[in-house]
Each structure stands twice: as C-alpha cells, then as structure tokens.
C-alpha cells in the first residue's frame, strides 16, 4: 500500500492508495502505524512496524560523532520547532530500531532506546 501525507502529494504522487491528513497517527494494519512528524516538511511521517522497527525518513537518526540521536536541522525545511515537538511526541512509543532515510541507523533494547531518545531530545531542545 502506498501511503503519503496530503501535504506531500504532488502531480507525480496524486494516485497513491492511502493519503493521510492531519497529525493523528493512522493504523494501516495490525502491524504498521503511520505517525505524522512535521518538521523536515509539513507532511513528514514515520512508520512504526510491529512496535520494534521505526522508519524515520528524514526526521531523526543516530549520530556517531555526537554519540546520540539527532535531527537534521540544516534540512528542516518546514519548521525546526515543529520537528522538536514531533520528536517529543515520540515518547509515547516503544521501539528498538531507528531506521532513517539518511544518517545512521541504531538498535538498542527498549529501555536504553528511551534513554537515548531523551538524550537526543535534550540536544534538539537546546539547538532550538
């Protein structure tokens, strides 16, 4: 199933199967949740699969040089403060993998991932 937020739909993507809108998570099936995460763009979204694998697109990734999860401020084309708010809302979810479209992926057990997310959020908030 092709899924895209309505804010991202253009001429070449108007025929997608499942357009979504708004900012509430959308359950695609019993295993997959689409979570709107505006910031990089107004229609940025992430996919949480089986409460384990978090496909983050251009939202967040692991930084080996910084030693924490981070966001791409230099390509936050929509709104950095929205990106930070979106990242803060991710506290509601448990996952073990961050699988970005760009940047490094990372894997931690759930408890450590929560701690790493908090560390990354502190950095994002201070970079605001």
What are these model-derived regions, one by one?
Residues 1-28, 118-123:
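Active-site HxH/HxHxD metal-binding segment of metal-dependent hydrolases
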Residues 11-12, 33-38, 42-127:
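Metallo-beta-lactamase
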């Amino acid at each position: 199933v092709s899924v895209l937020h309505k804010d991202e739909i253009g001429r070449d993507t108007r025929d997608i199967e499942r357009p979504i809108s708004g900012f509430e998570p959308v359950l695609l099936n019993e295993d997959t949740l689409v979570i709107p995460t505006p910031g990089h763009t107004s229609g940025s979204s992430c996919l949480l699969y089986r409460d384990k694998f978090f496909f983050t697109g251009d939202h967040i990734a692991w930084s080996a040089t910084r030693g924490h999860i981070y966001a791409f401020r230099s390509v936050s084309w929509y709104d950095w403060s929205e990106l930070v708010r979106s990242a803060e809302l991710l506290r509601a979810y448990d996952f073990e993998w961050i699988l970005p479209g760009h940047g490094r992926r990372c894997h931690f057990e759930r408890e450590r991932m929560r701690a790493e997310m908090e560390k990354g959020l502190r950095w994002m908030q201070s970079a605001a």
